[in-house]
Amino acid sequence: MPEGHTVHRLAAAFDRAFAGQRVRTSSPQGRFSEAAQLDGMVLLGAEAVGKHLFLPFAPAADVDPGAPVVRHVHIHLGLYGSWTFAGDPGFADAHAIGAPRLRMGEREEELDGAADWRRLVPRPTVRLRIAGAHGLADLTGPTACEILDAQGRQAVLDRLGPDPLRPDPGGRERRRFVEAVRRSRTTIGALLMNQKVVAGIGNIYRA
């Protein structure tokens, strides 16, 4: 399962690839028909919190991400989910592995540099396709892929502990983690795996 650092890397790739662009969205698999609600909207950016990815969509690029009109696509890759990017040279990641295509998940694979991403037919397993001016991203096999309003997004965040990769200028989140550990009699290894205590850590960093 991709851990927090991978999801943060994924969010950064989305920012570079799509932030501020009006995009096309579809669900070739048909299991995320809500994609039609987002088609033609602007993808404001991307946010990673622990193992969760949030993609805020709005009618225009100048809409505040916290505005009521914003719809947040919430994605958790789980054990089998992955994103595949394809596009113009340098798309999504200036240091992309196997550019111009990289898979952000458990696996990474290469696309023939001569191939035209605009002609790529989505696999039947693609839950969500996002296409912009210079490339596209295909999502397959996620545990969660849903549209949330601001309250729904906050409900997900309220279930999570601090994410050590997010800015914490006042140290509030660090103190929250320390207090949770001190209150518990559970072993530190088990606490690190508890997403309510600290978000994003999995077996790799626990080990």
Identify the residue ranges that each predicted region occupies.
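Structured catalytic/nucleic-acid-binding cores of DNA maintenance enzymes
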Residues: M1-A207
